[in-house]
Amino acid sequence: MEKQIQRIYLAGPFFNETEIKNTEYAEKVLEKRGFTFFSPMRHKVDAKPGTMEWSDQIFAMDKDEIHNADAVVALYYGGYSDSGTAWECGYAAAIGKPVILVHADRESNANVMLISGSTTNIYLEDLETYDFETLPAYGYQGKMF
């Protein structure tokens, strides 16, 4: 029997208003659906931002949280691929974690490494109904590069 999804790592950039809004939306949906989740946007470290110590602490925390998660839900903005999010998706896939790639819009080009390396491809609004128990695999139907 496969392990039930209970704890989710919510990957995605949060560098502008749209990304923050979408992250907040995903957090609300996951909370409403009863999942425990780790959202890097909500977690800080003690080191001074911009220092190597800060970088090392963020990296260690996020890597540990990916290990602790049952799955990764990644907010993806197509051609604009946040390097941190891409790393988190690749790392999660490499250690056998399901990766649910959540496309923030239907117009952007998508990177083949992210769409093919993910368990499934859904859109932001699909988070409300996606079946995390059976993890159906949906192929990406949009433009890709």
Predicted ranges, named:
Residues 1-145:
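Conserved catalytic or regulatory cores that recognize and/or transform ribose-phosphate-containing ligands
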